[in-house]
């Protein structure tokens, strides 16, 4: 039996009584954002909208984007990345679980020195794929040209964000490259690996 999204009490500033809001709404108010699904236009627009609102509300407070995503639509992922670069506050990225494909691209887009992977997280990079399988030959050629432009854009961003040379990123993107948290740190996708709490 599905439980749905849990609700928690929250008192709005200036209000006497608390209201019940879903847990994600409560966390957004604390500047904690979540990408816990495949990247598509809907989730990209939601994240961008929240970032823009938080940016206009207070430009001095950082945002924290938790990533556990198998990837998804290239343009939707690039739009989230662009929004992260546009907002004034630093956007910390935290990888938990898996950040693959556009998920790893968004993870790498966090403020440099503020990108973290949890100890058992996995990161995967590869080249963008075309979703165009059926159509006129001319349309396929235009699609292939667009995919090559997107691949070039993504390669340049990864090189800039990781400090790795373009040729190495391009070579690695030819196949699925899976990285442990430590390997992702060595590669430059994240800056730190979180330490496990050993006091338990």
Curated annotation (Swiss-Prot):
Reaction catalyzed: Hydrolysis of proteins to small peptides in the presence of ATP and magnesium. alpha-casein is the usual test substrate. In the absence of ATP, only oligopeptides shorter than five residues are hydrolyzed (such as succinyl-Leu-Tyr-|-NHMec, and Leu-Tyr-Leu-|-Tyr-Trp, in which cleavage of the -Tyr-|-Leu- and -Tyr-|-Trp bonds also occurs)
Documented EC number(s): 3.4.21.92
Example GO BP: protein quality control for misfolded or incompletely synthesized proteins
Residues forming the catalytic site: 101 (nucleophile), 126
GO terms for cellular component: chloroplast stroma; endopeptidase Clp complex
CDD domains xref list: S14_ClpP_2 (cd07017)
Subcellular locations according to the entry: Plastid, Chloroplast stroma
Keyword line: Chloroplast, Hydrolase, Plastid, Protease, Serine protease
Organism superkingdom: Eukaryota
Class of the enzyme per the UniProt entry, highest EC level: hydrolase
Entries under Pfam families matching the protein: CLP_protease (PF00574)
Broad class of the protein's primary localization: plastid
Cross-referenced InterPro entries: ClpP, ClpP/crotonase-like_dom_sf, ClpP/TepA, ClpP_His_AS, ClpP_Ser_AS
GO molecular function, one term: serine-type endopeptidase activity
Recorded family membership: Belongs to the peptidase S14 family.
PANTHER family xrefs: ATP-DEPENDENT CLP PROTEASE PROTEOLYTIC SUBUNIT, CHLOROPLASTIC ATP-DEPENDENT CLP PROTEASE PROTEOLYTIC SUBUNIT 1
Primary role: Cleaves peptides in various proteins in a process that requires ATP hydrolysis. Has a chymotrypsin-like activity. Plays a major role in the degradation of misfolded proteins.
UniProt name for this protein: ATP-dependent Clp protease proteolytic subunit
Source organism per UniProt: Adiantum capillus-veneris
The organism's taxonomic lineage, starting at the top: Eukaryota, Viridiplantae, Streptophyta, Embryophyta, Tracheophyta
């Amino acid at each position: 039996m599905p439980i749905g999204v849990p609700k928690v009490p929250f008192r709005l500033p200036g209000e006497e009584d608390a209201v019940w809001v879903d847990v994600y709404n409560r966390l957004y108010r604390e500047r904690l954002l979540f990408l816990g699904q495949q990247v598509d236009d809907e989730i990209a627009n939601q994240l961008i909208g929240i970032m823009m609102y938080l940016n206009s509300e207070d430009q001095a407070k950082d945002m924290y984007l938790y990533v556990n995503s198998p990837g998804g639509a290239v343009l939707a992922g690039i739009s989230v990345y662009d929004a992260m670069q546009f907002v004034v506050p630093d956007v910390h990225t935290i990888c938990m679980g898996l950040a693959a494909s556009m998920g790893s691209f968004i993870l790498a887009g966090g403020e440099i020195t503020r990108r973290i992977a949890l100890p058992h997280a996995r990161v995967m990079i590869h080249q963008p794929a075309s979703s165009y399988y059926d159509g006129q030959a001319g349309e396929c050629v235009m699609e292939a040209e667009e995919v090559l432009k997107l691949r070039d854009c993504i390669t340049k961003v990864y090189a800039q964000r990781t400090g790795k040379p373009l040729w190495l990123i391009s070579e690695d993107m030819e196949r699925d490259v899976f990285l442990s948290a430590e390997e992702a740190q060595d590669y430059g996708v994240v800056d730190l690996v979180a330490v496990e709490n050993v006091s338990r």
